[in-house]
Amino acid sequence: SDNKQIKRFFALDSRAYEEGALSVKVKELLGLVSSTVLRCNDCITYHIINCVKEGVTSEEFFEAMNVALIVGGSIIIPHLRKAVERFEECLQLVEDGKELPI
């Protein structure tokens, strides 16, 4: 894209998830919780894939989802269900030695 604002935003987004005082893994969990509270299914999927790539365990995933549920309330339950399905699908892909999407 020739749009400088979009390019700058994409660069900022990439840099926000780089290793720093917080690990990439923690930042992806934060992104996942935020995306769940905001009810953005595409964003949830994106962060789940990155969480799995970063080695997030089931225990870590469900603990993060508990935070999302408290912050977002019961309205996020449909998104939470999809997130659990997607997380389990991604874990299965890894277990089967297959590549994760994106």
Locate predicted features.
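Amphipathic C-terminal alpha-helical segment
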Residues: 40, 71-78
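Short, solvent-exposed positions on alpha-helices
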Residues: 24, 42, 59-62
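Amphipathic alpha-helical segments within well-ordered protein domains
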Residues: 14, 31, 48-52, 65-66
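Iron-sulfur (Fe-S) cluster-binding segments and ferredoxin-like electron-carrier domains
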Residues: 46-61, 87
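Alpha-helical scaffold segments that form or flank carboxylate-/histidine-based iron centers
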Residues: 26-35, 64-73
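Short, thiol/selenol-centered motifs that function as redox-active sites or metal-ligating centers
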Residues: 30, 34-46
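Acidic, glycine/proline-rich low-complexity segments that act as flexible tails and inter-domain linkers
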Residues: 1-26, 76-102
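Residues in soluble alpha-helical coiled-coils and helical-bundle/repeat scaffolds
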Residues: 17, 38-39, 56
